[in-house]
A protein has these predicted regions:
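Ankyrin repeat structural motif
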Residues: 41-49, 74-83, 108-117, 139-147, ...
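Ankyrin-repeat-protein effector appendages
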Residues: 24-33, 149, 182, 191-234
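Ankyrin repeat boundary/linker residues
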Residues: 59, 93, 124-127, 157, ...
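N-terminal segments that cap or nucleate solenoid repeat domains
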Residues: 25-64, 68
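Ankyrin repeat A-helix N-terminal signature
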Residues: 35-40, 68-74, 102-108, 133-139, ...
């Protein structure tokens, strides 16, 4: 028994040591990986992975290489990294942003579809969500796809903002209507006590504010109770 325990410990030590060798990388390798991910240099990326660099390596700013590739729409690097067995599709950067989130805010529908349908990326991660990011810039088609594939319309951001509030801020009235027609709650307030209607006022979207007030009156049989105080929100 003692012999077996010693052998087990030795084996574990060897495995952990081997693992550290597999995923060790120098500063130069990280720098080269960062450039390659941004500029879609698939040959350099393959060379680095073959040399033992982890596909989940972070750049000096805390961004995963897949995140960088998605942000720059480096299609060959995206395809290669996402097909590596050890890749973490949902690995966030230090701000909590995932590759799917950056694809969503950029309005890159083909990459969004690929990450969700083929790679099963999480559409409802904690913190800010891909849907909220898409709505921030008014990307209707991305939002429609995410909702169709399970994104929670009324999910709360860290400051309790919603996708509806973000869509109002973007000024895309078609996106606002889509979210409302798919269950967005007009009564929800963020940590500052602001609703989507307040967002329309703060971000000077009067055409949206008018429509939302009309919808409020129809839904709740009353006029919208104006907020006692207003201010910019995060």
């Amino acid at each position: 028994m003692k012999l077996n325990i010693k052998l087990s410990h030795s084996l574990a030590a060897c495995l952990f040591g081997f693992s550290s060798l597999i995923y060790s990388q120098s500063e130069d390798q990280i720098t080269n990986f960062t450039k390659a991910a941004k500029f879609d240099d698939i040959f350099e990326v393959k060379s680095l992975i073959k040399a033992g660099v982890s596909p989940n390596t972070l750049d000096p700013k805390g961004n995963p290489m897949l995140f960088l590739a998605v942000k720059e729409n480096s299609s060959k690097v995206i395809d290669y990294l996402t097909n590596l067995p050890s890749i973490d599709i949902n690995l966030p950067n230090k701000s909590g942003e995932t590759p799917l989130m950056i694809a969503s805010i950029e309005g890159n529908l083909p990459v969004v579809k690929y990450l969700v349908l083929t790679k099963k990326a999480d559409v409802n991660n904690s913190g800010w969500t891909p849907l909220q990011y898409a709505c921030t810039r008014g990307h209707l088609e991305v939002a429609e796809f995410l909702v169709t594939n399970g994104a929670k319309v009324n999910a709360l951001s860290p400051n309790n903002s919603t996708a509806l509030m973000m869509s109002v801020m973007s000024g895309n009235e078609y996106l606002v209507k889509y979210l409302l027609d798919n269950g967005a709650d007009l009564k929800m307030r963020n940590q500052q006590g602001l609703t989507a209607i307040d967002f329309a006022d703060i971000y000077t979207k009067p055409w949206i504010g008018e429509g939302l007030r009309s919808r409020w009156a129809k839904l709740y049989k009353s006029t919208y109770p104006e907020a006692p105080s207003r201010g910019p929100t995060n």
